[in-house]
Each structure stands twice: as structure tokens, then as C-alpha cells.
Swiss-Prot record:
Domain of life according to the entry: Eukaryota
Quaternary state and interactors: Associated with the spliceosome.
Record gene name: RSE1
Protein's recorded name: Pre-mRNA-splicing factor RSE1
Function description: Involved in pre-mRNA splicing and cell cycle control.
Any GO molecular function: nucleic acid binding
Keywords, comma-separated and alphabetical: mRNA processing, mRNA splicing, Nucleus, Spliceosome
Amino acid sequence: MSVDNESLYLYNLTIKHPSSCIASIVGQFLGNKKSQEIILANSTSIELWKADSNTGKLEKIYQQASFGIIQGIDKIRLVGTQKDYVVITSDSGKLVVLEFDIEKLQFVPLFQEPHSKNGLRRTSPGEYLCVDPHNRAILIGAIEKNKLVYKVQSNDEGKLELSSPLETFSKHTLTLQICAMDTGFENPMFAAIECDYNARQQDNGEEEDAGEASLLLNYYELDQGLNHVVKHKSNEKIPGSSSHLIPLPDFIGGLLVCSKSTIIYAHPSKDKLYLPIPIRSNTNETLIVNHVIHRLKKNNFFILVQSQLGDCFKITIDHDEVNESIENINITYFDTIPLSQSLNIFKSGFLFANVATNNKLFYQFEKLGDDNNNTTLQSCNFSDYNSIFELDISKRSFKVAGLENLALVDIMETLNPITDGALIETLRPEVPDPFKQLTALSSHSYLKTLTHGISTNTVVSSPLPIKPTAIHTTRIFAESANDEYLVISSTLSSQTLVLSIGEVVEEVNDSQFVTNEPTINVQQVGKSSVVQIYSNGIRHIKHTMRNDTIEKKYTDWYPPAGISIIQASTNNEQVIIGLSNREICYFEIDPHDDQLVEYQERLEMSGGSISALAISSSSISKLQRKSSYAIVGCSDETIQAISLKPHNCLEIVTLQALSANSSSIAMVPHGYSTSVHIGMENGLYVRVTIDEITGKLSDTRIQFLGSKPVQLSVIGLPQLQQNGLLAISSRPWIGYYSKGDFKMTPLLNTNISNGASFYSEDIGGEGIVGIDDNNLIILTISNTDGEESGLNVNDDFIINSVKLRYLPRKMNVDSPGDNEISSSSYIYIIESEYGITSPFPVTVLPDNQKESTNENIDTPEIDQDYYDAFGFERSRHSWASCVEVIDFNNQEIVQTIELPKNESAISLCRLQFESQQTKNQEYLIIGTTQDQKFLPNSYSNNYLYTFTINKSSNKNKSQNEILEFVHKTELDYQPTAIIPFNGRLLVGMSNFLRLYDLGQRQLLRKASSNIEYLKNIIRLTHQGGSRIVVGDSSMSTTFVKYDSTENQFIPFADDIMKRQITALVTLDYDTIIGGDKFGNIFVSRVPETISQQSDKDWSLLRYQESYLNGSGSRLKNICEFYLQDIPTSFTKGSLVMGGKESIIYTGIQGTLGLLLPLSTENEVKFLGDLQLLLRKYFDYNFDDFDKDKNGYNLLGKDHLKFRSYYNPVKNVMDGDLIERFYELSQSMKIRIGTELNRTPREIEKKISEMRHRSAF
């Protein structure tokens, strides 16, 4: 590919996929009859989860990116089989049937049946998807006009087969909902709520009121004999508020039509029945949004429906099987859970709630609500539709209560919707290196902090009598399950302390260890011996079991006089030591009597003193009990591989230079290869692969772990069926293999300075024992709540949440100075929520007088737990809004300022006014609007609130006095964007830019400029000097300069296309990055000549004529990329210490990703060519698919078209696609590598390097 040297090239990586799931389905996708799995589908990926019926926990099995937009998902199964397939509709224009391949651990497409053009259109089938309950047919429908039906059958080989689609269409018809009816052995039938918009128009051309107009309930029958779809028009119309259909089991037939506060039973050949829905007290209506049907034994079943407020109702039906008629339909209040997109019930008695705007929840049924005494309504009391509304509201209202029938057992952390995000870098006293955390306003009323790492749970913390410097663990017998000795060494006091491990940790007095010298290493060798290596020798202790007692007999080995042991490495069969005279001594264990047998020759290292030494541990590799090589680190900044094979023992086979001295080395086999892990004194960690035959070192990977020397030790990870690595620098890390790559992840909640692997059944299995100052620490790797031991490799983040009052909109991070410890980092958050009434008193008075926000106000006691569970009281066209201050380090709210009723906070910024004599006094400005309504948008008043920030006096004051109210200023338009600008406040409102300074009673307007061709300014960013960039809601971005002589803001360059801006950030003086509401990310730059004129020849550029309803010049479009998520924030920074600065973005559906700038022309060409080859490999043409030459394209969507959905992708490499290189077979990797003139290992190294430059 050709490369423009003056352009910018980016590499996109998705760090966290969207968590907003459009649907969830439960089935037996693994083919196991005794277990069920659940599939979650978001717009761009599908996830497979498994529920543990014993613990009630959900475990992710697999996640697969779709590289397309998923519209609908359902399941289908062939008769006589026990495995479910997945049916998906998407923007690829194909109906896709997937099977989960257990061997490959991925979803594999069985069919990709094209039915329409690529893309999303209202006439393209795919918006609706439903499968016949008896798996005989699949219907896909468009929003308007078209529907397709596929017959499902099995071929001669017993495999699933789809027929050609049968089409049916209705002119001028909009489809609102479709469901598949259960007709038993009759022809498959589907029901749809539809609207004939042509008939809705009156003769005079006016339209009926949508709320009063009726809808149609039409039936579509697949005549299997005639192979034709027949449309049955309904004779009676249904209410205009009808929005949900619930099909009933075949022995009853028909369906339930859910409308506003009403349920209607409908059947093509039976009379209708009417049932009112209970209404929550203090509300006016109930709308059913989703349901789940659960069948019990025989013909028993119940329906669980959920309302728009989250209230769940249980519907049961009294059916007369003799007369085949319904006697009664009953509905009663069940429980209240968060509003969900879908509900799923497992056979094991669990309920999964696919919550729409919060964490997904997993419940267990405690009971079925049969003894519920709350409001119960029955259809037998109502003869027609109008009789429902004659019922007194008090007889159908109910009060919500805590969970009675359900018990919460697991929480699946999600981030959607993210409204704002930031990267915060803090310093902590216990860790000298910066600590990076992502914060996001997400999940409806939460501030979520994402920390890269794995949580730990401290089991034991005990002081020690000596100052420890190293710690070791060992068994006594080879067949022992638990570690029995804990050996603590101190070089400061030249002591060794031996502790026994059991129910109580206590000192051992008869261990026969040398205790008056520091221990270098301890190892169980042979069958029943232990080796202690200390500075002046090796003690071999043999244990013999006689008469239930253990006899101990020891022998000693001493180095030559005046020589000491400085390094050692051991396994069950081998011992190798490094002496102070630079000699290497090698021992093997006699298998008959466990004695040490020294190799007659010694090797003198020529590269300086020995700084590190390692051999492979036999406990890791059972196939090869002895290590073939030893790795020696020397003080001349080299490592050398030494053969331990019989024919060339102690012969140097490889030498490799390092950038610093090695401080620790470990060898860990994995699969058919062995990795050499090197910790260095400069804080770098290096991983290389050693060839088992030649001993050559290759495939070097480097990562920065901290500012202190790196110490390594091998630990057991039985839950991953592998051994991992514990690396300790300025903070501890754990290394393990995941998804084909080795990952290093920090350990949180601990600050151990030395550690070792530790196994004990008393702590539930494998753990880590370490030293923290003078304390002995025993910890386990656990989940976030510390309840169970286990390493979750599917999530790189630990999420901590702070509950907020209302829906958060924007935040401003107030970080301390570079030399400060972050004990006073605050986050200021504006929150506002529509359609609710707040119970909290106003703490900012509505007049313009200066009032303290911290006066003692007598407030009634507010049940916060009630509002957290059930939400605030609903009220039309009402707003509640507040400002909250979060102490970031302590993760707590320190101040809340409730704004006046019906005011909504929409913008904020923090600045210092240059006109003020008080130096370093910061102000927080909040922009609000009053009585805002939508469709059409209207408001009554707009204000700017001014607060002082009193951080410096916080130590002597109550924490509630961080913000103090100064005054408020009335505005003409909504202050949708505010930023500091050269010591003043710049406000974007409507199409005006106004400059304000601080006054005594209000803000003083200093300048006002009207940019005529703009519509609504919603984003502002300061480029530096007098230049700003304006982001408009429909007119994209415009570069503007402040002319101080005329006191005006004058535009001089704007975008080449119209965009609906949602996020905007400065990259440099001439360049910006932005996102729009259609999911695009773009980078724009001012042409160099225009930029120079704006600074040097402003008089020429100032009076240029407008061009095509814009400024006289246009920006240059550098990058273009489609995300399929609306960007809400951009932050410049790195997610790892010492990483390269990149652009971190968040998306409203919960997406986290980064855009990494590429450095060299060769890098751009290589990644561009690799991306092109992978596009060809994952070809979207399924008809010509060859599994030896192609990879599976999940949805059959062309990757280039996906990333170019609205505009052609430009100068952005898709790292998500490139990382699929790991999935390729070895032969395909070689073939692609040949075309790129690279080996597969070189390509994998480059892909890994790209990720670790700024991420993990």
C-alpha cells in the first residue's frame, strides 16, 4: 500500500467490547443434555456463558466479534437432536445459522442465506426474527412491507437444511412486533402487530392521532402443502398502544396482546378475553416490555412479564382441557427488578435479567409467588375492553416491595451507557510508580472506575520476628498434596526461620535446616528429601517414615574455602548453583537414594559475576522431568544458555545481550515450547523462547513493570491447567497464557516485596505467600468481592462503582500537581434525569443572592435504599438535577448540591479567572436549562452557576464545603458547551460564541459572535493561543480564531462534510479528533498554508468570502473509521506505565478502545498488507468457502464495507481483525508470512508489540 508521509495513521484496538445486549437466549449450545448455556448478543459480538448450578455463578466461555451489526438472534434445533443452533439476522443481508464448535471453541456458520442488499433499510428483512416453536420455519421481517419465511428440515444425512425463502409483502404497512405462535401439528403461524399508514390518512390529508388510532393484528400462515405463505387479516382492530405479543402453548393456542395497562387474549377462531394490568401506586399506566414463558411438568406453565418500570407480574391461565377453552387469566405482582431487554429462565431454577442500562443480574427462584397476597386481577371479571377502565384505580394499584420470590446470586458488570470518560493517573504512597485508572459515567447513576489488574484476597497477615528478605515453600515428600514448610530468610540478620503450615502457622524446631545463615533456595527433591541451599553450602535432608514418625538425616556439601554460593535454581531432579568465583556447579538427584550427585566438571563464566540463574521446574512438565538447559545471567548485561544434556553438559550454546543486568530468571514450559522469563534491574521484563534442540534464544518480548528490579518466581495456576509467573517490581504482577499469548497483569490489593507459590487445602487450593514489610502475607487470587478463589482471564479490569443520585451527564477531573500525592483528587459530576420528581431539598437557592450550599437545612429522612431499588417517582416533563463531588481516592461522595426543580445541568468546566486578584482560585461553572421539553425542543430559562473550589482549606473544614455558591447568570440560549479560554469563560449557545468574565453579582459578557451557518454548538475545544474548534450538532467542526482587535470570534476553516458531533478533542495545534452520532471517528487537520496565514497573515484570511454556506477554507480529512458505537469521550494517554501516548475512546454502548499512532512507514505498509490478506482470508462469500484457504466470516459481511459504513475507511488499521491472525492454522500463518516476507513468529511478535505499546 502507498503511504503518505505527511498523514497520520492509526491502529484501532477494542479493549472492552460493548456490553449493551440487544437480546439473550438460553439453550443447549454445547450439546450437553444436562446443562444449559446463555448467549448474549450485542450489536457487534456474541458471547457464550455457562451457569454453574452449584455456585450460582456465570462463567464466560467464549466471545466472538461479528464485524457486522447484529439485528436479531434466536435458536433452532432439529427434531431428535439435543444441540441448539443460533439464528442471526444482521446488516449483511444474510440469514445466518451458527453452530458452536467445541473443538475449535468458536461459532461456525452452517448457512449464510442472502436475502437482501447489504446495509440497514426499513424494507430489508432482518429487523424482526422469530422461529416456530417446533423448529419448522423461520420468519424474518422488515419494518415496512417485506417478510420472508424459510422452511427448516433435515436432509438425508440428518443435517439441518433451509429452503428457498417464501416472500410475502403488504404495501403501506409498518410492522411493530412479530411473534411465532405455537400451533402444535398445524401449519406454522406467525402473528404481527401492524399499521396501515395509508389508511390512517383522512380524506382531507390530515393524520389521525397516533395515540387514538387502532392497529391491526394480522396472521401469517405457512401452508406446508402448497408451500405458500397466507396472510389472514384480523377482523377486529387492537388498541393503538399495543406493543407486545406473548404466544401461548399449543394446548391453549392464541396469544396475549399487551397494550397500555391492558392485556387482550386473541385467537384466530376464538373470542377475545380482556385483563387489566396492575398499576404501581403513584403512576398512571403500565406497559409490558418483555416476557418469558416457563413450562413446568405436564401442561403447567407460567408467564413472567415485565413493565417499563421493572415490575414483574406472573400470569397464569386456567384452562378447561375438556372444552378446550380458557376459564380465566390471572395476573399478580411478582417482584421488581431493573428494566431488562430480555428475561431468561434456566431449568435449574435461575433467572437471567438482561438489564438495559445497568449490570446484568442473575437470580435464583426462591418460590413461584403462589402465596402472593398482592393485587391479583382476573379476566373473568371483565366482559369487554371498556369495562377495564371502569374499574377503580385503587383496586388495581399495588405497592412495590423488596425481593420475595427471587434472590440475587451473581452480578455481571457492564458499562453501558457510558456518557463520559477520563484517564486518571495518580500517585500512591505505597507505590512509587504512577497508577492509571479509567473512569466512566455509566450504567445509569454510577461512576465506575476501571483498574487493570486481578484482585487478591488476603487470608493471613502476621508479623514476623525477623526482617525478611526472601520466602520459600516446599513439600517434604514428593507425593504430598500440600506445602508443609514455609522458609523465611533474612540477609540483614543472617537468619532462616522455618514455619510449618497447617491449621496454625508455627515455628519448626526440628527441621534440621541451617538457621543461622540466609537461605537462597529450598526444594523438595527425589521422593522424600529436601535441599536447603544457603550461602556457605547445601544441606540435604532425607525424611524416612517409621512408626508414624519422621526420621531426618542430613548431609552437607560445602564450596571451596573462601567461596560462597550467590545464586541457585532447583527442581525435583536437578540442582544448579552459582559461586562467587563465577563458577557453575551442577548436581543431579540419584533416583535410588535421593542423594546429590555432583557433575565432575565446573563451568567458569567469562561474563562477570553471576546475577541470576534458572532451570526449568519438573513440576511443570511431566513429560520431561529434567531441564535440558540452564540460563545464567551475568553482570556484563548478558544471559547465556548452558546445556545440561549428557553429551555436552555445561557447554555454553547461546549468548544474548540485555539492556541491563538481569536480577532474576525463570524458565516455564508451555505446550511444546519453553519460555525464558528475565527480570532486569531497570524494571524491564523480557520473555524469550528457547529452542529445545539447539538452545537458541528467539522471539524476544519486552514489557516495563516498574521502577524497581524485577524478581520472578513460578506459581501454580491449576484453574488454568498451567503454571504462571509471579513478577515483583514496584508492584506485583502475575503472568499467564491466555488466548494464545502470554499476559502480564498487576495484582491489586497487595504490596508484597517477595513471594512464592503456596498450596494448601486450608485456603482452598493454590495461593501466594509473600512478604510485606515485616509481615507474612498469605493471599489468594479472587474475584472482586473476594468470595472465591479463581483467576478470571476473560476480563482485564476490576470495576469499582460509586452510586450517584441521577443519570450522570459530564464530569471534570481535578487532578493534583505533578509533585503531589493524590490525596485530594476530586471529580465534579453533573447529573440530570428526565421524567422524575426528586425527594431531595434544593441546596442552591433560585435567586441571584450568594447563599452557602452548606447551611443546616432541616430535611425529612429519605429512604435512599428504596429509591435505589425502585427509582424516583415519575412525573411528565419534570427534571431533577444535581452536582456531586467525588473523592476519587476514597471512592466516596463528599458533597451533593441539588439544583432547583425542573432545572437540568447540561455543561460544566473548571477555570481560573485572570481578572481576579486572588491567585490560584479556581471556579466551577455549571450550565443549566429550565423546563426543557423534547419534540419539539423548548425551554423557559437558562443559567450559569458559579462556584468557588476550596481545596486548599479542605483540611481545616468540613468536606461538605469544597464547592461554595457565588452567583448565577441568566442566559438567552442553552449553554451547551463551556470551556476556559485565556483566563475567561467561553460559552457556546445556539450559534453564538460568548466570552464572560467574573463579576460580583453575575458573569459579565465581554464578547459575542454569531456564526450564521452553524445550528447548535455542542462541543468546544481550545487549540492554544487564540484558536478554538467548534463542534456543531449537525454542521460538523469549524476552526475559529478570536480577533482581539475587533473582539470577535471569526471562523476560517470548517469540515468537508456535515457531521453530528458527539465528542471532540485536540490532538495538536492544527489537528482534532471527533466522533459523530452514527458511530464514526474522524481526524481533521487545517492545511498548513491556512494555518500559517491564520497566525501570520490574519488580515488576508480574516476577510475571505464564505464558500458553500461555510467558511472560506476547508479542513483536510486525514482518518476515517466506523466503530458501530457512538463515541462519547476521547482522552490522550496510555493505559500502561511507560506506554506510548494514544487516543483512548469510550462509546455509549459500553465500548472501550484506543487508537494508537503508527510510527514508521514500514510499520504502516506491513500492517496494511497484513490487514488486506486477512480480509481475503475471512472472505464474506460463503458459497465459495474452502476451509483450507478461508476462515469463517461470522455474518458474511465484507470487513471493508463494515468499517466504511458511512464514509470509506481511511488511514486506520483494524487491530481487532489483525489479532485474528492468532486463530489461523499454522499452514495458513506460513502462507501469509511468505507473502509478507516474515515468519509467523515475527508477525505474532509485531501484533503483540502493537497491543503492549499502550494497552495490555
